[in-house]
Amino acid sequence: MWIKNISLKHYRNYEEAQVDFSPNLNIFIGRNAQGKTNFLEAIYFLALTRSHRTRSDKELVHFKHHDVQITGEVIRKSGHLSLDIQLSEKGRITKVNHLKQAKLSDYIGAMTVVLFAPEDLQLVKGAPSLRRKFLDIDIGQIKPTYLAELSNYNHVLKQRNTYLKTTNNVDKTFLSVLDEQLADYGSRVIEHRFDFIQALNDEADKHHYIISTELEHLSIHYKSSIEFTDKSSIREHFLNQLSKSHSRDIFKKNTSIGPHRDDITFFINDINATFGSQGQQRSLILSLKLAEIELIKTVTNDYPILLLDDVMSELDNHRQLKLLEGIKENVQTFITTTSLEHLSALPDQLKIFNVSDGTISINEKKATD
């Protein structure tokens, strides 16, 4: 899979931009605060209908305007797709091949992406919510039903929490009705996550072993707030534990267990990776990203698009080399950087773009080499 071109209207500091890409490597060079990250964010947004930097769509709108449009042409093994996202004060519209998509799960997955940004280094030591977000984005791209189940779960969870917060005399019969719905959706969310972690664990360990020069093994554990013995019993255990938590939940006025409380833990040679060195943690994240690429390819039969946002300067020469070696020739890759100094040997099939104050131009020197 690769994105052939993109058109931006009123996105961040871009009033208008139209860019044609190389199917292989695309490098965007410019000083800081010129729009390099904004541009990669637009590709990410076109794929996932969300930013990795903000929850507010208003922040994406150019200060002179009130609406945004991002369009792109994607080439997949199954054919060409036209993607279109429009944001306005009335809301958002998503289209595939000019047809409106009623549900998010109908749109997500049309173009798959893997993003590696400096903030990903917080995946090891950061808040559990970062790791849940990591799971939700990856699983959502390869399992469209997951997003619907997660949305339904969050809807019932909000109902349950609102009821607990606003009701003085809680009706446990009504609470049990909500428990049934929460267990239905939540057990499927946990099952999807559990399966994904098992597959990710195997693939990431292969990469980490190579990157660490065969000195370290990586393992990933899913930490569920629900105790269960096997996948077939998740719903039953979830429901029982929800019932047992009624008194605590009524007292605290929120739902104390469920996938919204779950986490993942990383281990390097059986030691919690939070105690690892910065270099070990960077190798871990690099292994995760390379594993994501392979998992998406396995499920969808198409390689995802790789977005590397200002991370090459965060990696030493060894890890840069392993990253570039790990990227298959048919993985379209986008790199942002302030210079080419810290990039290892580059392939011939690439395009280099200059980015300056919301304007993108082809690097003519490279184009004529």
UniProtKB/Swiss-Prot annotation:
Residues reported in the UniProt entry to bind ATP: G30, R31, N32, A33, Q34, G35, K36, T37
What keywords tag this UniProt record?
A: ATP-binding, Cytoplasm, DNA damage, DNA repair, DNA replication, DNA-binding, Nucleotide-binding, SOS response
Quote the subcellular location field of this record.
Answer: Cytoplasm
The GO biological-process annotations, alphabetized, read as: DNA replication; DNA synthesis involved in DNA repair; double-strand break repair; SOS response
Tell me the Pfam families matching this sequence.
Answer: SMC_N
Is ATP-binding a UniProt keyword of this protein?
yes
Q: Which SUPFAM superfamilies match?
A: P-loop containing nucleoside triphosphate hydrolases (SSF52540)
Q: Please describe what this protein does.
A: The RecF protein is involved in DNA metabolism; it is required for DNA replication and normal SOS inducibility. RecF binds preferentially to single-stranded, linear DNA. It also seems to bind ATP.
> What is this protein called in UniProt?
DNA replication and repair protein RecF
Q: Which organism is it from?
A: Streptococcus agalactiae serotype Ia (strain ATCC 27591 / A909 / CDC SS700)
Query: Which gene does this sequence derive from?
Result: recF
